[in-house]
């Protein structure tokens, strides 16, 4: 098979033809016909409600494109859920707890003697908080550098080009914009009959700031967030039980990878109760009691814990914005309906990130934000949602991009599979961290890579070679014929690619 040249491939994914819908075309032309604000005008070209990953990135990009921009953020700190009470603080705790676990259980294998290792939880939480503060200040600095106006307060629509803002200092102001982008993110999804008090019954926010390590922790929900936070407190000494209504953990994950991942977590003493329904939660006593039953019905049982983490997903934050007053259409879940240029049914009103359909991921929201303001500026923007990577930041990590084997079977696509275990990777063996594998799915006829799934200590970093390859329609042979430095973990991706179209060398 001749090697395909990535450099010669047409990067068709960077552009997109305008929709054939007359309604969409009308909205787009109306939007552009508004023109851009002059430097002396009090009207903005772009107003963004929400300063999370989608909102703040959109604001900076809009300003870089020459658009007068204002960003409104109710929290008083930029970065949204991700930076303040999500991605960043959780990764800080995941890293700190992993260091503690390594010191306690792995240092001896490397000839390092430690007499005693203790958790200083206040110091650990302080390190997490400092990381958050430094990063939020960093975004404020980027706003100043790019001349983005920052308004701290809660914004609501008055009209399609006016937002009333109740500022955090108690004042009120009106912000006008030719184009308004809703980037308000998402909130914790509640469960019927369960009241989150952020003390004994906590959301992911409360789980980031527990005052002590609970002896027993029950996690409701076996998704990304639940497994990550369960890992944090499990490493620090909690007995962790995960209760999940579905029959699998992380249902969107490739089935083969998911099974190995669950076995890995079980080795770390994380317990799973799958196909289990939470009937009620009682926190009136010192601890918390959960009444559960089989998902299909049956005999009930009682589970006891010191803390219960409710991690049953997230819901778009669109209530309280007065969207209905200006006629913006939403679906039953509260997501704003937009076209392929992020424009709602109301001319001049756009939406990005968690408030529109698609994966609720910070990096997806960032891409939405860039593409949206590019459209507003009269340029081409594009986000391919089939090629957005996902990562579970446990240890080992699990990262994926593209299709799973189950999806390809359902779609009737003929494919080949190539796998390579890290047990056969020299760098992984050298650092005594060889759990996991790389799995590549490629089209049987063309060898085009359709999906890549990695379980490894640093899978979240390794996946991006695959993301680039998939975006450029690379074949498995393309990756296999690229020289990879030795010894590196990334050689496992090369070997898996070799296994996909031919044979690997080291197994």
Curated annotation (Swiss-Prot):
Cofactor note: Binds 1 FAD per subunit.
E.C. designation(s): 1.8.1.4
Subcellular location: Mitochondrion matrix
Transit peptide (residue range): 1-36
Free-text tissue specificity from the UniProt record: Preferentially expressed in leaves, flowers and siliques and at a lower level in roots and stems.
Cellular component annotations (GO), alphabetically ordered: apoplast; mitochondrial matrix; mitochondrion; nucleus
Signal peptide range: none
This protein's UniProt keywords: Disulfide bond, FAD, Flavoprotein, Mitochondrion, NAD, Oxidoreductase, Redox-active center, Transit peptide
UniProt feature coiled coil, ranges: none
Source species, domain of life: Eukaryota
Cofactor(s), names only, from the UniProt record: FAD
Active-site residues, record numbering mapped to chain: 486
UniProt subunit comment: Homodimer. Part of both the glycine cleavage system composed of four proteins: P, T, L and H and of the pyruvate dehydrogenase complex containing multiple copies of three enzymatic components: pyruvate dehydrogenase (E1), dihydrolipoamide acetyltransferase (E2) and lipoamide dehydrogenase (E3).
Protein name as it appears in the record: Dihydrolipoyl dehydrogenase 1, mitochondrial
Taxonomic source organism: Arabidopsis thaliana
